[in-house]
Structure formats: C-alpha cells, structure tokens
C-alpha cells in the first residue's frame, strides 16, 4: 500500500480527512487532560483509585456504545448531522463536569458523604457525555476515511488516528504547565478549541456513503458478515486492544509519575510516548507495504507486552524512558491498523463492521480496562500494606469498598490521604508515610505487569492469522463487485 497516490474518490477528501483528524484530536485532548487531573479529583473529593477508574471507565463505555449505535445509523442520518450532535454533546459534557466543584462545596459541610457522591455523579456523567461526543465522531470518521481512500485504507486510517496522540500531546502539555498552578476546571475547558475547529470544517462539504451502501448492500447482508469466524476473532482481539491501550493510557501518567516521584515527569513521559505515536502514524503506509498489516500488528503487540513488563520493573529514570519508548512504539499502529484490516477483509459490512470494532474496543476499555487496572492497583497496594502493617492499613484505608467483576471486594487506600503523602518530598515523610507510599507504588507497578499479559495474547492471535493467510497465498484486500443482493466480495 503505497502512500504516493491517495486514490481518493472525492474532490474534498482531504478536507474531510483533516476534519476527522481534528475531531479525534479533540477527543485526545479531553482524554489527556482528564488523565492529568485524576489526582486533583482524588485529592479534592477523596476518591479511591477504583472510584477514579470507574469515572474514566464510564467515559470509555459511553464512547463504545455510541460508536455501535452511530455505525448503524450513520448512512441513514447523515455524517454531517451526526457531527453537529457530537459538538453539542462535547459542550454539555463540560457544563456537567464543571458543576462538580460548586455542588460539592455546597454540601460538604453538612453531608460529606453525599457531597462526595454528588461530585462523583457529576464527573461520571460529564465523562459519559464527553464520550458520547467522541463516539459519534468515531462512528463517522472511520468509515468515512476508509471510503475516501479505498486503496490506501491502512495508511490514511493511521493518519486519521494520528489525531489521537496529537491530542494527547496537546492535553499533556496543558496539564504539565498548569498542574498545581491552574485549577483543573480551566484545564477542562481547553479541549473545546479543537471541537470548534472540527465543527467549522464539517460545515459545507458533502459526505459520501460507505462502499457497502454505494453498492446497495442491505443491512441484513451487512450483519451477515458477523457470522465469519475471522471477524469474531478480530473483535475479541480488538476488545483486548481497548483494554490495554486505552485502559493503560487512562492511568499511565499517574502510575509513572509515582515511579518517577514526580507527577510532572509522569505527564512529560506520557507526552513523549504520544509524540512518538503521532509521528510514526504518518508512516504506516511504507511499513505495511513491506511487512503486511498483520505483520505490523504482531510486531506492535509484542513490543507492547515487552514495554509494559519492563515499565513495571523499572527503577531508574532512564529505564522508565526506555521501557515507555518500547511500549509507545508497540501500541502506535495497533488501533487504526485493526480497523483497516476489518475494512479490507469485510467491505460488505460497511460502517457497521468497522464501527463494531471501535465500539467493542471502547466498551472493553471502559468496562474492563479503566476499572480493572484501578482495581488491580487497589488490590495489590491494600493487600501489601495490610500484610506488612495492619494497623497502618486501618488508618489509611478508604471508607468505602470496591468490587470488580467476580473478583474479591476490597477497601483500597484513601485517595486524599495517599495524595497528601505523594505531595510531600521524600525527606519530609514519616516512616509510616514511606511505607504507605511504597505500597501505593508497588500497586501501580504490578498493575502494569498484569496488563502485559493482554498484548502478549494479542501477539499470539496475530501470529496465528499470519500463518493462516500463508496457507491462503498471503494477505490480500477484498473489494465489492456487483450491487444489491448480487454484491459479492472479491480478492484484488
């Protein structure tokens, strides 16, 4: 897949490509800023790591649901109308999120528990509405770009999704320069800048329909694609990808900040790995031309597993940077290349199959990734402190209990108390505070090591697919020939 010729089908293809790029960039900015201010929320409102994981998980869950719904209605409602809806949801999400502080302050003196719960609801539903806006954009721009550039899907979907790490970089820099100096509410508002830009770019140009819709493929025939075992396997793998990439991204600056003993350094490391992703995604075309999309996915998943394992064991700043580099390079091409593979191999599915991939990935990140990694941190840290210093654990444990799926109920460490310890210099901490901090740090390290098993499993799945396609003469793109019920998928 050469990137030398766009082979686009519309004269306004590049304007729509960059409008989609800005929409995904807006999602990345908002996601990054929220990740950077998790510590502020924990300290201000007394949330545990599991509480914070559930808040971030709510955002990713909403993201996933709307991608699925949006994919089903995109061609019927129209891409332009859906982008306007996304803009409205982004605006409302800011209003609800910003309401958390005044509501909390008005209640905390008379009802501390109620104030905490009210703040939690504001942040959760604000995140959920933010995710609805993100999901609506995602439901539109993925099939849009795959349609605009039918012979270069992997290359241009990677360029489209360079907007995500670009947004993470912008949001991370905002957090780095403003953390501890500017209220989190002001940081939250800044993601509206790219929102306004993509909204303006979407006014005017005509949006095409997907390849499947152009060939008159019915909804029933689109849905029949899900009977293919390979598509079901790819959906399962993409669910794992959502867990490891987005679930980890929602925690990574927090965890590495603790490892580096500097919240600001954790944010800078996050910005660094996101910058790598941003730059490398513009070069997916030449790489895929040499090793195929599945080869790229296998290498990426393998690097991701190695990077997370090393990151969980790193003890010096240099080792943390090296480990994060391996992880960052590994995850760079996974998400957009998975979307491209599904679009190339199952074109009759149209927006529905590519939307299902994005939706499943986001749902997995929201339901399992964010909460699961938060739970793992709480579980390991609380058990470590409980075993070594039971009385100290009783002093620092949260007032509330948390549960994740079928795993045991736990009482994590109180976010406000642990946050106060983190804010102190090492020399200012008491021996007891050092012990609590060590348990907190250990929980973060082990959570990263546990997560490394997910990309390792993904790498095995990609290897099996590579071996399968070798028996079929190699990986090849599929196109639609014919119209209506006569439409068939043919290898080109």
Question: Model segments located where?
Answer:
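Central cavity-lining transmembrane alpha-helices of secondary-active solute carriers
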Residues: 57-72, 271-284, 451
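C-terminal ends and interior cores of transmembrane alpha-helices
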Residues: 88-116, 303-315
């Amino acid at each position: 897949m050469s990137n030398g010729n766009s082979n686009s089908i519309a004269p306004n293809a590049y304007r729509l490509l960059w409008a989609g790029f800005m929409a995904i960039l807006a999602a990345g900015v908002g996601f990054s800023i929220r990740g950077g201010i998790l510590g502020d929320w924990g300290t201000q409102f007394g949330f545990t790591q599991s509480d914070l994981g559930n808040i971030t998980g709510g955002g990713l869950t909403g993201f996933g649901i709307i991608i699925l719904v949006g994919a089903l209605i995109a061609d019927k409602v129209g891409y332009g109308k859906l982008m306007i809806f996304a803009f409205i949801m982004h605006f409302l999400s800011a209003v609800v999120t910003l309401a958390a502080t005044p509501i909390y302050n008005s209640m905390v003196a008379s009802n501390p528990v109620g104030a905490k719960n009210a703040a939690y609801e504001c942040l959760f539903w604000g995140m959920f509405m933010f995710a609805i806006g993100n999901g609506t954009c995602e439901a539109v721009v993925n099939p849009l770009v795959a349609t605009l550039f039918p012979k270069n899907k992997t290359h241009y979907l990677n360029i489209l999704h360079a907007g995500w790490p670009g947004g993470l970089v912008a949001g991370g820099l905002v957090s780095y320069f403003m953390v501890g100096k500017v209220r989190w509410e002001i940081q939250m508002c800044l993601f509206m800048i790219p929102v306004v830009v993509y909204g303006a770019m979407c006014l005017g140009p005509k949006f095409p329909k997907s390849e499947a819709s152009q060939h008159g493929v019915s909804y029933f025939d689109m849905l029949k694609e899900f009977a293919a075992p390979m598509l079901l396997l790819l959906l399962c793998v993409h669910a794992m990808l959502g867990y490891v990439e987005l679930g980890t991204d929602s925690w990574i600056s927090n965890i590495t900040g603790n490892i580096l003993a500097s919240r600001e350094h954790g944010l800078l490391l996050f910005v660094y790995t996101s910058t790598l992703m941003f730059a490398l995604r513009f070069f997916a075309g030449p790489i895929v031309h040499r090793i195929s999309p599945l080869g790229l996915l296998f290498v990426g998943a393998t690097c991701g597993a190695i990077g997370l394992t090393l990151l969980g064991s790193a003890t010096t700043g240099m080792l943390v940077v090296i480990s994060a580099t391996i992880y960052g390079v590994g995850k760079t091409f996974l998400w957009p290349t998975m979307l491209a593979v599904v679009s190339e191999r199952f074109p009759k599915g149209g927006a529905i199959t590519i939307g299902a991939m994005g939706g499943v990935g986001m749902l997995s990140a929201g339901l399992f990734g964010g909460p699961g990694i938060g739970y793992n941190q709480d579980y390991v840290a609380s058990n470590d402190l409980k075993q070594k210093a039971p009385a100290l654990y009783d002093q620092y444990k949260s007032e509330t209990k948390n549960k994740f799926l079928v795993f045991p109920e736990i009482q994590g460490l109180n976010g406000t108390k642990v946050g106060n310890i983190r804010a102190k210099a090492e020399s200012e901490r008491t021996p007891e505070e050092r012990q609590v901090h060590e348990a907190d740090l250990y929980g973060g390290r082990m959570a990263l090591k546990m997560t490394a098993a997910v990309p390792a499993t993904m790498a095995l799945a990609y290897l099996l697919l590579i071996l399968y396609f070798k028996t079929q003469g190699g990986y090849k793109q599929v196109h639609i020939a014919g119209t209506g019920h006569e439409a068939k998928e043919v290898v080109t």
